[in-house]
Structures are given as C-alpha cells and as structure tokens.
Design a protein with these regions (language model features):
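Phosphate/NTP-binding elements of NTP-utilizing enzymes
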Residues: 1-187
Length: 187
C-alpha cells in the first residue's frame, strides 16, 4: 500500500482532519517510510544480514587456515543458500563490501560466472536473485545488484528474458563482467 492510499484511508475514516498538524506530520512520516522501503528494495547489498553458517561460508577459510579456493555451501532447502551466494557475488562484482565482511576482497574488477543446470534454471534462480524477476522491468535492478551499478546487459538469444552477460560498475571505477552459463550446454 502506498502512502497516498494509506493517507486517504485515514482521511476517509475521519480519524484525522486533512488540515491538522498531525496530518502533515503523518504524511511526512509515511513519505520517509516509503523512501526507506524503496531504498531497501533497491540496495539489498546493504541490508543483507547473514546467519552464522552463511557468515562462516563468506569467511572462505580453508581447513589449513588459509584462503579457500573452492567452497561448498550445503544446507537444507529454502534457508538462503542461493541468496547468500548472490550477495557474495554482488560484493565481489562491485568491490563494495559490508563492514562485517571477513572474506576475500577484490580491489579490482572481476570476471565471474553464475551457472545452473540449464539456461532456464539459471534465468529463473540465479538471474532472478542477482538482477530481479526475469521479464519484470520494474523489478530489474532491485535484487542483489542495484540498478545504478548495472552498466550494460547482453541478452541470451535462445531463452526468453534471459541474459548472457552483465557488466557491473566496480568501486575502482572500472567494470566487472558476469556471464550466465548452463551445465547442459557444456559451459
């Protein structure tokens, strides 16, 4: 519900007079809340708060105590594995890391792959977590990667609403590149 809808409901119920100081104050509070909600949906990178198992995964420490070159996040269904992976990838692509980040940091742009079993699964799961719901222009850039850091996209011609690659603005001023791949096409 938008602030204007909520305000109209309040006025219609005659709880507040449109001209009262309280009404003006309520309108301002609702406007600030709407701006906050919009910002939060636009910058998921900033609001991600990992669970302890996700935080440990992000630390990327090997059994020997050094930096792990390969990792596997195994957990139950629907507990945030894909989401945490998308958040980590967005940090690496952009170079913008949260204060709590203890894992590896890329100070230069990177070249990365996000791969799934098929192009359709890659689109429906990985692309959705990183860019927003496939085919929904309003939701594009309201996922792990914010719209203002997406420089360019290249469509996957064989799959509706799928991208083959995305260019992402890195903190260094240069650009990272993300490719969407599928295992069934041989990567």
């Amino acid at each position: 519900m938008h602030k204007t809808d909520l305000l109209e409901d309040v006025y219609d119920s005659e709880i507040l007079d449109r001209e009262s100081p309280e009404s003006t104050e309520l309108a301002e509070i609702l406007k600030l809340k709407e701006e906050y909600d919009e910002s939060k949906s636009k910058y998921q990178m900033l609001s991600y708060k990992p669970y302890s198992y996700q935080r440990e995964f992000h630390r990327a420490v090997s059994d020997a105590g050094g930096l792990a070159r390969q990792r596997c996040l195994m957990a139950a269904n629907k507990v945030g594995k894909t989401y945490s992976g998308a958040m980590e990838l967005s940090y690496h692509l952009t170079g913008w890391y949260p204060d709590w980040w203890e894992g590896h940091k890329f100070n230069k742009p990177i070249l990365a792959w996000a791969a799934g079993q098929s192009h359709y699964i890659t689109r429906d799961i990985l692309q959705a977590e990183l860019l927003g719901e496939p085919g929904d222009k309003i939701q594009f850039g309201k996922a792990a990667l914010p719209l203002d850091l997406i420089v360019d996209t290249d469509r996957n011609p064989g799959v509706p609403n799928a991208y083959a690659s995305v260019i992402v603005k890195h903190k260094s001023g240069m650009n990272s590149k993300l490719f969407f791949k599928s295992y069934d096409s041989g990567l």
